[in-house]
Amino acid sequence: MRIALLTYSTKPRGGVVHTLALAEALAGLDGLDVHLWTLGRGGDTAFFRPVDPAVTVHAVPFPDLGDEVGPRILRSIDTLDRAFAAERPAYDVVHAQDCISANAAMRSGPCVRTVHHLDTFTTPELVACHERAVVEPVARVCVSAAVAAEVEAGWGLPATVIANGVDAARFEAGGRDTEGRARWRRRCGRYVLALGGIEPRKGTLDLLEAYALARREVPDLRFVLAGGETLFDYRDYRAAFDRRAAELGVEPEVLGVVAHDALPSLVAEAAALGFVSTQEGFGLAPLEALAAGVPVVARDLPVLREVLGDHVAYAATPDAIAAALLDALAAPPDPARGRAHSHGFTWRRAAAEHLAFYRALG
């Protein structure tokens, strides 16, 4: 079976992390020839990390023209479509991982789509992209039952639930990386960590407010943010974040994208991970933190209850988030339970379930 997985970026966003790990796990199964298609934005010719050579990577050049979000979405679809359509007949399965790659793939034939989470957009081009990528694929995968229920409620469409895996061993090893952790400790001190950038969906302003409250009790506590490479324009939200930080008299450490090899020790050295997204599809970052032995404070969402169970603290407001962070700092939970929970999510299991899904398509 020859499989094409398509994603919109080479950067370390959650959906891209998923796509790489799934491709490698599928390539480890007998009889599968796995190809990974992506847009190489800004001159990228490879993904943010090395990819198993058993996976064939096709990075389609996508120069930065400085265009606005709407035109950039349409150009992304056009560019990926032109490159992929000529090779499409070689594949038995075409599997898109986001709305851009789904729209590109469906121009030349049917595809299946993983709905990682549902978004609410205002840019007309994105609204249309999102809608078509939910409605028109021949079949859908969702990474959680909560998202599958949203798809059913919103569109009356069924989806197969296949949970993500997590590279738990990698983040558990981060806890043993004494040199790496020491480097982060020298740079950042004692810190609450947020992963995923400064974005509305990530609830970053709420976490900022919570951090400022917690800092009144723990004056040496720092707030560190990592990640944030995105296709979308969140400049207004970032400006609001910076203004509010200044008003609160705090100075968050914004790292941007962290090198792949340095991320596990960054996570492991954190005093706690704040994961307070207002909308999520799964939640890889908190599972990675649990694997590293780090306490997690999460927004109280059904999907996070589904994935994380009772292994994290839940909160819904800045006051409650601050209180949960302080509890985690004062009395961290036994890391063994959370670590064991994270090890229950494997990419090998996810790959086997995907293969069964592909075979059921006929």
Task: Please tell me what each predicted stretch does.
Residues 17-21, 199-213, 236:
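A conserved mid-protein helix/loop that constitutes part of the nucleotide-sugar donor-binding site
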Residues 146, 165:
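Carbohydrate-associated surface elements
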Residues 4, 141, 185-202, 208-211, ...:
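Conserved donor-binding/catalytic core segment of Leloir-type glycosyltransferases
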Residues 278:
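Aromatic "clamp/platform" in nucleotide-sugar-dependent glycosyltransferases that forms part
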